[in-house]
């Protein structure tokens, strides 16, 4: 929260990041219960900071800007990578070049990166929503829906069940 305040993040962005953090914690805890090794602290920090780059820019570059901010603040590289790779369902090296981003691979690869990226896709503003709503948004915007579906599938393989169901079951428990 200190970094969000320092860099002037809008209150809506902070609330969104808090909601994504709650969703990411649900998934990280479920992974731990399945015996998966997951750095929960990195997941929570990455989820809370994933949109800090929006304090500078509201484009596809916000992931890169956010990564630069948190790296400059001395945040652990694992968290820097989570912030950098959360945009869309990831951005390939070729897409990055076309978007005039640094020539890097922005596709979530670690369990922590995938958890935060997926959690972000499950949250619209401060509301958890069905995965199909994000599929629809990706389709309308012309984004790579297959990469989004693959992200969910990868998490499902790790978790042994549908991550969307895990999230909604837990959300229902807390209501």
Located regions from the model:
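Divalent metal-dependent phosphate-bond-processing catalytic cores, especially two-metal-ion Mg2+/Mn2+ enzymes
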Residues: 6-36, 49, 75, 95-175
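His-Asp-centered metal-binding catalytic motifs of divalent-metal-dependent phosphohydrolases/nucleases
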Residues: 20, 38-73, 80-90
């Amino acid at each position: 929260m200190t970094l969000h305040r320092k860099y002037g993040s809008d209150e809506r962005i902070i609330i969104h990041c808090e909601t994504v953090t709650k969703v990411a914690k649900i998934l990280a805890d479920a992974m731990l219960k399945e015996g998966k090794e997951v750095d929960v602290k990195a997941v929570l920090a990455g989820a809370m900071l994933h949109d800090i780059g929006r304090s500078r820019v509201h484009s596809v570059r916000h992931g890169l800007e956010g990564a630069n901010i948190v790296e400059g603040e001395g945040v652990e590289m694992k968290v820097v990578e989570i912030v950098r790779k959360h945009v869309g369902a990831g951005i390939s090296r070729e897409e990055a070049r076309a978007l005039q981003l640094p020539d890097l691979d922005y596709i979530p690869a670690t369990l922590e990166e995938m958890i935060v990226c997926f959690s972000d896709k499950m949250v619209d503003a401060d509301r958890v929503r069905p995965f199909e709503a994000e599929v629809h948004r990706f389709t309308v915007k012309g984004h790579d829906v297959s990469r989004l579906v693959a992200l969910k599938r990868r998490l499902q393989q790790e978790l042994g069940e549908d991550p969307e169901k895990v999230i909604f079951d837990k959300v229902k428990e807390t209501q």
